[in-house]
């Protein structure tokens, strides 16, 4: 990735970050709060917050509820007002006095639940051990560290007296890894934000997420050969862009259709072949289902297993361009907004995008043994989020 030109390095002047004194103070505060931020990440990581059987006041199990309580406790100690919505999701809120009753808001959505520990750890998975300038533990990257980084970034702006024309919420979900039920519940109680992000993906700005449609093609035992012939002819021996199925859609934002996740299996005494379509926004789920059905042979049938529609935010919008310029300014890169095959809270929460925390080249960290977050990266992402919030504060967010 190319570094910024000299002109882009003057982003603070070009993008009207005119108050260099405030920028300097923000960067100084980011450095100052790192020890406390690291300690709070370690506290949150020590809670094993995988989903288990529901208990009283713990709809996703004891761990997620305890982690949510801890995140809200940390927020309160930083001086934020907090709200716990039925122990499923909660938030910390920063509101200027003059807009206390204003309903629209900027929302930053992260999560405090984690995937199971798994085997093969060198470091204690709930220990938050620091070694080689890295903190290790389940959830340090996905997503306890990044959402607390955003909380502390907002705390810095609050401390410096930076005002927003709408409230800003840091939202802590407790069911991201196992179904997004937390944010679905949130939307039954609260309005969607006018803009925001989820720090649960990668840099730079992610303005779009591919759709993800999982299907199965079934056959009875007597038609098993027909299933094998269809799958081999139309999928396994064909390019993985779906051209043989006539679903090889592509667009400028996402590129071409991708077929993946191939699996044979048996369910309810029927054989099936399962696969996933990672599809661009130019096509729709029903269109894909109809086209696949039109190719099926007698004795086979198609069933939808799950679907997440694509997300596509206007990359030319003031919000996206502001965040991208902040990222380039803070990192020295000269990158452009991108799309992803992944899926985040942006699939559910309207008007938000994915924004950080993994830098280019950082892969295969979350969900694996010895999940880690580099402490230098932690400081940098906190700086990016703080500067991003500062820039958002200068926009006209009120509708």
Predicted features along the sequence, with ranges:
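Short beta-strand
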Residues: 81-86, 261-264, 303, 338
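An extended, acidic, His-containing surface patch that forms the Zn2+-binding/catalytic region
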Residues: 225-254, 301-399
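Active-site metal-coordination/substrate-binding segment of hydrolases
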Residues: 102-167, 172, 368-371, 375-380
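Acidic/His- and Gly-rich active-site-bordering loop/insert found
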Residues: 7-135, 164
């Amino acid at each position: 990735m190319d570094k910024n030109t000299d002109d882009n390095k003057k982003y603070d002047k070009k993008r009207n970050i005119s108050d260099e004194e405030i920028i300097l103070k923000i960067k100084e505060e980011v450095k100052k709060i790192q020890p406390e931020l690291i300690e709070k990440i370690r506290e949150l990581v020590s809670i094993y917050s995988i989903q288990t059987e529901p208990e009283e006041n713990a709809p996703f199990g004891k761990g997620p509820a305890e982690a949510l309580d801890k995140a809200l406790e940390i927020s309160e100690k930083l001086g934020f007002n907090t709200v716990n919505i039925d122990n499923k999701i909660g938030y910390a809120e920063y509101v200027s006095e003059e807009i206390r009753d204003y309903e629209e808001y900027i929302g930053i959505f992260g999560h405090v639940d984690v995937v199971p520990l798994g085997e093969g750890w060198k470091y204690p998975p709930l220990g938050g051990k620091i070694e080689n300038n890295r903190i290790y533990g389940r959830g340090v990257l996905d997503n306890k560290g990044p959402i607390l980084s955003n909380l502390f970034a907002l705390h810095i702006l609050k401390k410096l007296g930076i005002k927003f024309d709408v409230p800003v919420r840091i939202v802590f979900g407790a069911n991201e890894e196992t179904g997004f039920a937390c944010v679905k519940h949130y939307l039954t109680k609260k309005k969607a934000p006018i803009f925001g992000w989820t720090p649960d993906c990668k840099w730079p700005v992610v303005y779009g997420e591919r759709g993800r449609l999982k299907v199965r093609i079934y056959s009875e035992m007597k038609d098993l050969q027909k299933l094998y012939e269809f799958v081999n002819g139309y999928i396994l021996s064909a390019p993985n862009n779906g051209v043989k199925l006539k679903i090889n859609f592509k667009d400028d934002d996402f590129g071409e259709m991708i077929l993946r996740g191939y699996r044979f299996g048996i369910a309810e005494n029927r054989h099936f072949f399962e696969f996933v379509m990672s599809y661009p926004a130019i096509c729709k789920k029903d269109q894909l289902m109809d086209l696949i059905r039109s190719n099926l042979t007698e004795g086979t049938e198609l069933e939808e297993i799950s679907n997440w529609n694509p997300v596509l935010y206007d990359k030319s919008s003031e919000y996206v361009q502001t965040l991208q310029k902040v990222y380039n300014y803070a990192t020295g890169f000269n990158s452009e907004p991108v799309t992803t095959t992944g899926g985040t809270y942006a699939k559910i929460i309207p008007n938000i995008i994915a924004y950080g925390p993994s830098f280019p080249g950082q892969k295969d960290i979350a969900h694996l043994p010895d999940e880690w977050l580099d402490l230098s990266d932690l400081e940098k992402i906190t700086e990016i989020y703080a500067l991003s919030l500062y820039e958002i504060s200068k926009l006209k967010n009120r509708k």
